[in-house]
Swiss-Prot record:
InterPro entries linked: Cyt_P450, Cyt_P450_CS, Cyt_P450_E_grp-I, Cyt_P450_sf, Cytochrome_P450_3A
Gene Ontology MF annotations: heme binding; iron ion binding; monooxygenase activity; oxidoreductase activity, acting on paired donors, with incorporation or reduction of molecular oxygen
CDD domains, per database record: CYP3A-like
Source species of the chain: Caenorhabditis elegans
Annotated positions binding heme: C464
Protein name as it appears in the record: Putative cytochrome P450 CYP13A5
Family: Belongs to the cytochrome P450 family.
Length: 520
């Protein structure tokens, strides 16, 4: 027998042993859970667009309880729906759980030059968070209010045309056009509305529909393949939607830099006011005091540090990329679910319309007016409770071995929240947890966050940085629609909604009628 055959045989046995060792991790720990298959674990369960894996978690929770273990290729993941456990991981022990689960195709969060707020961790995440936070301040949100208003007016024109036909329309399609148009104008240098003629829309939709299949599956099982996929897609971005979008972002950034250089050469002074997120990031300076983490002290231990470094070119691309995707999909889905629930509950919709009529009596809607729409905020929060659309990112990676409520968690283990189960837990929400009741939020949401029971935008220090922008967009659009129309179900409305998705959980369609309010 030749030496090469012996080496090949030994390598195969070693590889097989390694994967069986990972696959049997939770068995050896005595932790219950679905086992799946060696090499795969249950990673394939999260690749079926028609049957979202995030909903599968709820089925497993019923079978195995609020804490159980799965393997996803080479990743070991603890699934939890115990609110106290969630609060412990996301808030109290953040210094032990500051990382997030990633796929190798996304790049090493410590080395990837284009790491963004969702993927970055440790010192780099804190720095990016510090530099990006001013972008979503009330001051800057007020600056982009006119852009949001213009985009709302443009969408209303399309909705008016659709409503005039007297037929139900798929509002999900309209909301996706709306959110991509807004994010294109405030984050991509887009100077005019491209609604219903945006060449980027099919690419963005592709990321959420097909972008997580084979490459992510293979990379999750064989991490080295993820590096190879990434290098290939970086070289040929048009092949894969996410890399194609990132290439588009890079072109937009280069165009703005060229414009700035040309203006400077021509002696044109800057206006002093940033046009959009690109300008805000290009001008970003972190010459401010912030709490820098020292690993020797623990991530949450704090020391004042000075940071005087500008965002790099690649970091700006990363931030714009993730803001584009998050700003497009989650806001469109939230609007869709809110509209559907209002159509199903006419009495709640009427109460909301009364608030809109009272607080926003004029055709033009202002920032201060939408800030007073408290019941609308309750409606949106309740819709996000019943349809936690982005729960795939509700996870943390253990960065230092620790014990959480009696469960020993090794470094490198992921903790994924079964958000759908958590958001319907009667111990948190009461016996009416299955009911759409916005009034539960009228006393504030601090109680539900403190219980660890509500995380549509995440929880703790890594909570979604753009949630105020998202709420502003939703309030603005719903205000304009509800001033003029009433949402109604039709024979084409799927009841209950058929849910699909992989990266997010989306309705297949939201077919509703827009009935004019004749009393106006």
């Amino acid at each position: 027998m030749s030496l090469s055959i012996l080496i090949a045989g030994a390598s195969f046995i070693g590889l097989l042993t390694y994967y069986i060792w990972i696959w049997s991790f939770w068995i050896r720990k005595g932790v219950k859970g679905p086992r799946g298959f060696p090499f795969f674990g249950v990673i394939h369960e999260f690749q079926d667009y028609e049957n979202p894996g995030l909903l599968k978690l709820g089925e497993w929770t019923k079978e195995y309880g609020p804490i159980y273990g799965i393997t996803e290729g080479v990743e070991k993941t603890l699934i939890v729906s115990n609110p106290e456990f969630v609060h412990e991981v996301f808030v109290k022990q953040f210094d032990n759980f500051y990382g997030r689960k990633t796929n190798p195709i996304q790049g090493d969060p410590n080395k990837n030059k284009r790491a963004h707020l969702v993927s970055a961790q440790g010192h780099r995440w804190k720095r990016l968070r510090t530099l990006s936070s001013p972008t979503f301040s009330n001051k800057n949100l007020r600056k982009i209010m006119s852009t949001v208003e213009e985009t709302v007016v443009e969408l209303m024109r399309h909705l008016d045309d659709a409503s005039a036909k007297g037929k139900a329309v798929d509002l999900l399609d309209y909301y996706q056009e709306f959110t991509l148009d807004i994010i294109g104008r405030i984050a991509m240098g887009q100077t005019e509305s491209l609604m219903f003629r945006n060449p980027m829309l099919p690419k963005v939709k592709g990321i959420f529909k097909d972008g997580r299949k084979l490459p992510f599956l293979v990379s999750g099982i064989f991490p080295i393949a993820g590096t190879m996929f990434r290098e290939f897609f970086m070289r040929f971005p048009s092949i894969q939607p996410a890399f194609d979008i990132m290439s588009t972002v890079e072109k937009a950034l280069n165009k703005r830099l060229e414009q700035r250089a040309a203006d400077e050469k021509a002696g044109i002074e800057p206006s002093g006011e940033p046009q959009d997120f690109i300008d805000l990031f290009l001008d970003a300076r972190a010459n401010v005091d912030f709490f820098e983490e020292e690993s020797a002290l623990g991530f949450a231990k704090t020391e004042i540090a000075k940071v005087d470094k500008q965002l790099t070119f690649d970091e700006i691309i990363g931030q714009l990329f993730v803001f584009l995707l998050a700003g497009y999909d989650t806001t469109a889905l939230s609007l869709s679910y809110s509209s559907y629930l209002l159509a199903r509950h006419p009495e709640i919709q009427k109460k909301l319309q009364e608030e809109v009529d009272r607080e926003c009596p004029n055709p033009e809607v202002t920032f201060d007016q939408i800030s007073k729409l408290k019941y609308m905020e309750c409606v949106v929060k309740e819709a996000l409770r019943m349809y936690p659309l982005a729960s795939i990112v509700h996870n943390r990676k253990c960065m230092k071995e620790t014990n959480v409520l009696g469960v020993q968690i090794e470094k490198g283990t992921n903790v994924q929240v079964d958000t759908w189960t958590l958001h319907y837990d009667p111990k948190v929400w009461g016996e009416d947890a299955n009911e759409f009741r916005p009034e539960r939020w009228e006393s504030g949401d601090e109680l539900f966050y403190a219980k660890g029971g509500y995380l549509p935008f995440g929880m703790g220090p890594r909570i979604c940085i753009g949630m105020r922008l998202a709420m502003m967009e939703k309030k603005m659009l719903l205000t304009h629609i509800l001033k003029k129309y009433t949402f109604e179900t039709s024979t084409q409305t799927e009841i209950p909604l058929k849910l699909v998705g992989s990266a997010t959980t989306a309705p297949r369609s939201v077919m509703l009628k827009l009935t004019p309010r004749h009393s106006n």
